């Protein structure tokens, strides 16, 4: 039976999610936005790349709870493709309206608050899965896949990143999503597992060189939030769990300098009798420099795991690479981010995921994702080598 899936937000990821659900399921998609022009542009693009028989649209303000509740009366699943600050309120609306929900997360503290509503979600008969997407999201699911392949897993190292195919100096990066989300990843600290215990690790630390075939050498560094709640879930199961973000060489030194200057701060400062928030000022300047419009991109991911397989000590490598698709005009980042959350939305609509507020690592099995990824022509290579 076809379900109704509401996508809140008609930007890059909203378009990608709508495309994938329409292409790979029989469910109805309702895409919504507060801005009619953005919505019209999204519908026009979606109509050009997939059959839109099951697509409709709605104008709604995500902050207008009464309008949202009215819209949710006939919905089965919400896909939140809006910034993370709206997700906690949306979770409350989802539970109140008895509508399941998935979101793109981006802030672990908010995700924790969402997961604390597990009993409320169970009572409402709904499924809430926050922090989907590429990372956190797909990277976690791929790490879960590693634990499913090995008989016993001791260590997991993850590195992933979305990069422009043709980097522009000096930052060698293009903006593929909200700049606030980018700075949030570059600020605060990450949480890893070391000797089976949760440790706090500062952003931009542990910079190392990682090589990929046909791409060359990249720099991997610690950024925040990439593992979401996975360290807490696996603290009694893994000795080591780490996640780093990939960038072209030189990028991290610039970002470290900006942070040292205080440009990531949200604390107001007085300049010529004007109150200025450094982070807002920084975003206003840098966003224009990093937003290169529609550019061809590359997404890379590597899961390196150590453990036991058939009584032998082995190293397991799961490599994935994705490129911009000229036929659909979907970037690699849009595909990996949007399709991970759309796969979860479809799984929920098909009643394949239990009720409650569930973390990504507990919601979606690695092999289930691998099967769905193959249907979407993901380029994933799995290699096991005896130590």
Language-model segments: which ranges?
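Conserved N-terminal Rossmann-fold NAD(P)-binding element of oxidoreductases
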Residues: 5-9
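Hydrophobic/small residue at the entry helix of a nucleotide-binding pocket
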Residues: 13
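Helix N-cap at the beta1-alpha1 junction of Rossmann-like dinucleotide-binding domains, i.e.
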Residues: 35-38, 108
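Rossmann-fold cofactor-recognition segment
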Residues: 49-64
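Conserved Rossmann-fold cofactor-binding substructure of NAD(P)-dependent oxidoreductases
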Residues: 60-74
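N-terminal glycine-rich "phosphate-gripper" loop used for MgATP/nucleotide binding
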Residues: 61, 76-91, 98, 105-109
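Rossmann-fold NAD(P)-binding glycine/threonine-rich loop
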Residues: 105-128
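C-terminal catalytic/substrate-binding lobe primarily of soluble NAD(P)-dependent oxidoreductases
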Residues: 149-387
